[in-house]
Amino acid sequence: ALSRDSSSLSYVYALDEKNWLLMLDSCQYEPENKVEGRIKESTLAWMDEQLLKAREQGIFVLPIAHHNLLAQSRMYTTQCAMDNNSEVIDLLQKYRLPLFFSGHLHVQRVRKHKAEPGVDDGAYGIQEIITDALSIPPCQYGEVVWDEDGSISYETRSVDVSGWARKTGSGNPDLLDFEDWSYRYIQKLISDQIRGVVQNLGEDVERSMAATYAGVYIDYYAGRKIDAKGIRNTKGYRWWQRNMPDSYLLRELDSMITDSDRDNNYFLLPEEEGWLRE
């Protein structure tokens, strides 16, 4: 590491002579372990020192933490964004950092910070990419590319399990057609969980409601754009409205649909904001 924070597990790693990774320990350990994240005041001071050095040397800094910088989900409204995220945002934006990576929520999301509603979309604001969980189909990871023109691109890719299975001579049909098998697996898993709550409505109605919820859930976690009008016109969604209008599951369904108004699987930081900027 190029530098380590003495009061946390945070550190700076130099990718090369022009790019640093600012790896931030956002976990809370004292007086007990917590789900919520927070950057210590002493760590913020250390970050300020490192970011000043980077600016003086013309270094591009990419900060990364486990906990989220921004509140990016209508479905999960607590324990995701860091408790002192406004302080962290202020510090990062003081140095005009354009991009932040995190996990924790593990719903594939890309969002720009806006100081207040109505701020022009073209105005500066740090953007956060939240990466979804590799363990949940479609088993995605993110590929970040520093391009020669100074731009930085991010795109999700799915682990090629089927390619690996063929290459290693596996005879397991689930691995050889992993994309199809994993989709059916997660669809059934979620549907079965929903049907544990949705009961006494008849086999066809319950199956339709569960399938609708599961389909939206899968697309939501994968960061795909969801056709809100199309979903709300399905028989399964109408069954939700008719049979369980006050259910928390319908509220979750609506939250996921509303959040998914755009695709979150590709992002381009243009060259004027990228790693070769002056």
Region spans (language model):
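Non-catalytic terminal accessory segments
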Residues: 164-278
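Short loop/turn motifs at secondary-structure junctions
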Residues: 18-20, 59, 96, 252
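Divalent metal-coordination and catalytic microenvironments
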Residues: 24, 47, 63, 104, ...
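Short catalytic/ligand-binding loop motif for oxyanion handling, primarily in non-cytosolic enzymes
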Residues: 30-32, 70-73, 109-111, 136-139, ...
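Extended active-site neighborhood of metal-dependent phosphoesterases/phosphodiesterases
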Residues: 1-45, 122-127, 152
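Conserved beta-sheet core of the metallophosphoesterase superfamily
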Residues: 78-160
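Active-site-proximal segments of metal-dependent phosphoesterases and phosphodiesterases across multiple
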Residues: 28-45, 54-102
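Substrate-binding and catalytic surfaces of secreted/luminal carbohydrate-active proteins
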Residues: 47, 52, 132
